[in-house]
Amino acid sequence: MRIKRRSKRFFKRVLIAIPILLVCTAMYLVVRRPSSAPPSKIKVAMTEERIERGKYLFTTLLNCDGCHSERDFTRLGGPMVAGARGKGGRMQLEGLPGDVYAPNITPDKETGVGNWSDGEKIRAIRDGISKDGHMLFPLMPYPGYRYLSDIDVMALVAYMDTLPAIRNYVQRSSISFFVSIMVKGVPQPVTRTIPPVDINGGEIYGEYLASVAGCEECHTPQKRGQADTSMRFAGGRVFATPWGTVLSANITPDKDTGIGSWDYVRFRDRMGGMRQYKDANFPKVGPERFTLMPYIAYENLNDHDLEAIFLYLKSRRAITNSVVPHPGHAEIKD
């Protein structure tokens, strides 16, 4: 009898403890702040070489215009609207967990980052933490930018400081409650020195370039809202927008469904396919040719970088995955 009474008391306590534990856990998840570190006190020196490197990163490799500049997606490749570089605005991807806005990153002191220190800008780029300490939604690819070398992130900041200031108030993103809690673990402060990668490192240098450019992020399909790591670079991630729906391509070395049969010349020509449209004369397109792939930016990748990226992609695991880029529309061959 005593054993039975003790067992009943034990299970009763357990039943009381479980909801208390769940409530405490939920409260912790709600009130906890994302990991962050104080911004560095660095002051980036403005040199012509650094600004030029930053321009290459901003406009080409990292394609910052893709989110932070107004673009015309009724035209092939979504060319940037003149005079709109860095002004920010609402992201037009469907299926996002709320209203997501890309901030104004011009030097405007009231609506942009003109009053931010260089250290605060670097922290936002690599750590995903804004000037006031709030977390940036990780549609901003700072999980990849945390690998930017110190000299590259300083170059990026230097170029941003040269942009014309645009007065354009952009509201803060409004994310669903559950998702806002789940993504709090994404920011990881960069607290170490990150040296430059040897530009003559072949596929190792290519891995650095592909990582900060976010190739894997777009070219890996998702499963239940998370990247399917078993299908890295295999394409098939769905991007739905007001202008059309497009699926990312398979860029693994699979010979039938990826780029396994491509040589470097074909890869280079594909990346530079927008060069034929001079003076921003990009044709009007419908959903059958809509693309989010930043060909307009990548046409300016230098041969050395492009070849390194190609070597890296060719070294990945080949995955058979046939992708129809524009569902419901006939495929347009290269």
Describe the residue ranges of each PLM region:
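N-terminal type II signal-anchor transmembrane helix
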Residues: 2-38
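Electrostatic cytochrome c docking/interface patches
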Residues: 36-59, 183-211, 257-259
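The canonical Cys-X-X-Cys-His
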Residues: 54, 61-71, 121, 156, ...
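Extended surface/linker regions that mediate inter-domain or inter-protein docking
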Residues: 141-143, 147-205, 305-312
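Detector for the c-type heme attachment site
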Residues: 67-73, 126, 141, 161-162, ...
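Electron-transfer interface patches adjacent to heme c in soluble/periplasmic c-type cytochromes
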Residues: 85-120, 143-153, 232-278, 295-306
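A cross-kingdom feature marking solvent-exposed beta-strand/loop segments within repeated
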Residues: 132-148, 277-300, 321-322
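Extracytoplasmic/periplasmic/luminal assembly and interaction segments
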Residues: 57-99
